[in-house]
From Swiss-Prot:
Annotated keywords: Chaperone
Gene Ontology MF: a single term: Hsp70 protein binding
SS bond list: none
Species in which this protein is naturally found: Mus musculus (Mouse)
Gene that encodes the chain: Dnajb3
Keyword DNA damage: no
PANTHER family reported for this sequence: DNAJ HOMOLOG SUBFAMILY B MEMBER 2 (PTHR45168), SIMILAR TO DNAJ HOMOLOG SUBFAMILY B MEMBER 6 (HEAT SHOCK PROTEIN J2) (HSJ-2) (MRJ) (MDJ4) (PTHR45168:SF4)
Pfam family, one: DnaJ
Protein name: DnaJ homolog subfamily B member 3
GO cellular component: acrosomal vesicle; centrosome; cytoplasm
GO biological process, one term: chaperone-mediated protein folding
PROSITE patterns to which the protein is assigned, alphabetical: DNAJ_1, DNAJ_2
Length: 242
């Protein structure tokens, strides 16, 4: 399971305000518009930071995430009377990282000139240098708006399926992540995480199952199993010749 506290660089007992500050700092650091030379890494980090913030900033989601992680670490089913005494499932559905970013900043993109009414460098990063002429005709802004960033395409649409569209056609499109965990009365523990994305028009689903100390990773392409790894060892797949 992803350690969202590590992603944001905060301790597990971090306050809601500390989590907000961590997200603000990292979202600005890894905003794709700010990292055109490291596009792929920036997109990955920006998305991961947004997901961490969505979970840890929500009291209910954070509680479930914390408890699920604790059960995973001890490998048990939880004490009697705890939420893990009976098996349960909780799914995290993530929004477009750009939507999270805009919402955090009041519906605006802080990298656009309109947000500040002037030079974003002066207002946002505390640089009080003169911005005279920054809005002159033909001037190139610090960065384009996020919706125009090539890696994410123009416009972001949330679908009823729970998936989020954030990619350009032919590259990546739908993306989702779900996690379930639980322990039974016999002390059995099972954690399931599933991620789905569209790559070059193909639906790639990766499912990671951890049950009683054994890890199983399945990768499907358009519903067909392409890879199976058990405890770190890739398994030979039987080819259906019919």
């Amino acid at each position: 399971m992803v350690d969202y506290y590590e992603v944001l660089g905060v301790p597990r007992q971090a306050s809601a305000e500390a989590i907000r500050k961590a997200y603000r700092k990292l979202a600005l650091k890894w905003h794709p518009d700010k990292n055109p030379e490291h596009k792929e890494e920036a997109e990955r980090r920006f998305k991961q930071v947004a997901q961490a913030y969505e979970v840890l900033s929500d009291v209910r989601k954070r509680e479930v995430y914390d408890r699920c992680g604790e059960v995973g670490e001890v490998g048990g089913g939880g004490a009697a009377g705890s939420p893990f005494h009976d098996a349960f499932q909780y799914v995290f559905s993530f929004r477009d990282p750009a939507e999270v970013f805009r919402e955090f900043f009041g519906g605006h993109d802080p990298f656009s000139f309109d947000f500040f009414g002037g030079d974003p460098l002066e207002n946002f990063f505390g640089d009080r240098r003169s911005t005279r002429g920054s809005r002159s005709r033909g001037a190139v802004p610090f960065s384009t708006s996020f919706t125009e960033f090539p890696g994410f395409g123009g416009g972001f649409a949330s679908l009823d399926t729970g998936f989020t569209s954030f990619g350009s056609p032919g590259n990546s499109g739908l993306s989702s992540f779900s996690m379930s965990c639980g322990g039974g009365a016999a002390g059995n523990y099972k954690s399931v995480s599933t991620s789905t994305e569209i790559i070059n028009g193909k639906k790639i689903t990766t499912k990671r199952i951890v049950e009683n100390g054994q890890e199983r990773v399945e990768v499907e392409e358009d519903g067909e199993l392409k890879s199976l790894i058990i405890n770190g060892r890739e398994q030979l797949l039987r080819i259906n010749t019919q």
